[in-house]
Design a protein with these regions (language model features):
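Exposed alpha-helical structural elements
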Residues: 16, 20, 37-40, 51, ...
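Hydrophobic residues within well-ordered, non-membrane alpha-helices that form the packing/core
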Residues: 21, 25, 67, 203-204, ...
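Short coil/loop linkers at secondary-structure junctions
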Residues: 26-28, 111, 158
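A generic structural-conservation signal
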Residues: 29-31, 76, 114, 161
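Residue-level "edge-of-site" marker
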Residues: 34-35, 118, 165
Length: 232
């Protein structure tokens, strides 16, 4: 349950059942005092087993109600359908990317290289600053809609586009950094992003929050995966 909440981008100060249940449902475990819980469970085991059964059943009810309220099972099923990952697989951004990208790469007539042995190079990634008030006045905060997927779609950031772009006339390509050039005609990710983008817009129109969230997480993962040493 904790990993499922984190995968769906829920954030809590603590992920214990008591805390999450109080935050989402307004009620908690049948034994509220965490400092006395173990002693109370031991007492119930020896002297009041029906009350102990009630305590365990209430824990189960809380978990089920949290899953229902957050649409977690729907989210996990949809994520599995989109990525091909097992229902209980958490993280797995590289595996999800591989499942979606490699078959399309093969259809384009290319084979991805194997991972180099002992690769340890890392990329710094992006840095998100916290919004702490009081340092500056008149600060404008801009929230770009699906920023990373938009960059991929607009500038054709894509391994196949890079391979073709380096072989095509420079004037017919989209310039990148460190001498990189991306093909305007031959690419995979921009089309995949566009398909997922439209699917997410439809999900939002239909108020299908689990599907919308699953697609959003998948699209955002594409950007970081390409800088990962674990990605072919």
């Amino acid at each position: 349950g904790i990993d499922a909440l984190k995968s769906a981008t829920f954030r809590f100060d603590r992920f214990g059942l008591e805390y999450v249940a109080q935050e989402l449902l307004g009620r908690g475990k049948a034994i509220h005092d965490p400092d006395d819980r173990i002693a109370e469970i031991s007492r119930l085991f020896h002297h009041d087993k029906p009350a102990l059964a009630h305590y365990n059943l209430e824990d189960c009810r809380l978990v089920i109600e949290i899953f229902d309220k957050c649409h977690l099972l729907s989210f996990l099923c949809l994520r599995s359908q989109l990525t091909g990952l097992e229902l209980d697989r958490y993280g797995g951004s590289v595996a999800a990317f591989t499942n979606l990208y490699i078959p399309r790469l093969h259809q384009a007539g290319f084979v991805a290289p194997n991972l180099p042995h002992g690769a340890i190079a890392t990329s710094p990634g992006g840095y998100v600053m916290n919004s702490l008030p009081g340092f500056y006045h008149d600060v404008l905060v801009l929230d770009f809609k699906s920023l990373y997927p938009s960059i991929i779609r607009t500038f054709h950031i894509d391994p196949l586009a890079l391979v073709h772009g380096l072989q095509e006339p420079e004037a017919e390509t989209i310039p990148g950094y460190v001498g990189g050039r991306f093909s305007r005609k031959h690419h995979i990710l921009p089309g995949l992003i566009d398909h997922l983008w439209q699917a997410r817009e439809q999900a939002k129109t239909e108020h299908d929050q689990p599907r919308s969230q699953a697609i959003k997480i998948l699209m955002n993962a594409f950007y970081g995966v390409m800088g990962s040493v674990g990605c072919r």
